[in-house]
Swiss-Prot record:
Protein name in UniProt: Ribosomal RNA large subunit methyltransferase H
Molecular-function GO term, any one: rRNA (pseudouridine-N3-)-methyltransferase activity
Physiological role: Specifically methylates the pseudouridine at position 1915 (m3Psi1915) in 23S rRNA.
Catalyzed chemical reaction(s): pseudouridine(1915) in 23S rRNA + S-adenosyl-L-methionine = N(3)-methylpseudouridine(1915) in 23S rRNA + S-adenosyl-L-homocysteine + H(+)
Major site of localization recorded for this protein: cytoplasm
Family: Belongs to the RNA methyltransferase RlmH family.
Gene Ontology annotations for the cellular component aspect, listed alphabetically: cytoplasm
EC number: 2.1.1.177
InterPro entries, per database record: Alpha/beta_knot_MTases, RlmH-like, tRNA_m1G_MTases_N
Residues at which S-adenosyl-L-methionine binds: L73, G104, L123, S124, A125, L126, T127, L128
Length: 155
């Protein structure tokens, strides 16, 4: 089963890349964790932000196959505990479809992306920096896997 983080933004600091890769490599081969970066449109003073969000959303959805699962990361999504995420991860493994976690740009996700969501997940009611969100998602997916496999990392 493939897990993919499709995120708007690229050229992250080295510590973000290192953190992401650390958790991605810890997962077993049958649970591959991939990162797909969507270029962020440059926002200027008179930028058409609505158009940029729409373009970024189209680019995100173009990376998703017709039968793949979409989980959007939204402040108004459902908060999951580690144990609840482990239950979801187990369901996704049984379903065996690719799971795409969608993280929008500074203004959030395009409505078209949200409309395609199978599930909506909230990491926190706090506003989190997008570089940190990448690492959090990787770590939480790894932690959920350790819960399912009885690995001592979670304790």
């Amino acid at each position: 089963m493939r897990l993919r983080l499709i995120a708007v933004g690229s050229r992250m600091p080295k510590w973000v890349e290192e953190g992401w890769h650390e958790y991605a490599k810890r997962l077993p081969a049958e649970l591959s964790l991939e990162l797909v970066e969507i270029p962020l449109n440059t926002r200027g003073k008179n930028a058409d932000v609505a158009r940029f969000i729409r373009q970024e959303g189209e680019a995100m959805l173009a990376k998703v196959g017709p039968n793949e699962r979409i989980v959007t990361l939204e402040v108004h999504g459902k908060p999951w505990s580690t144990e609840q995420l482990a239950v979801e991860l187990d369901r996704w493994r049984l379903d065996s479809r690719t799971v795409n976690f969608m993280v929008g740009g500074p203004e959030g996700l395009a409505p078209e992306v949200c409309a395609r969501a199978d599930q909506r997940w909230s990491l926190s009611a706090l506003t989190l920096p997008h570089p940190l969100v990448r690492i959090l998602i990787g770590e939480q997916l790894y932690r959920a896997w350790t819960v399912l496999s009885g690995h001592p990392y979670h304790k």
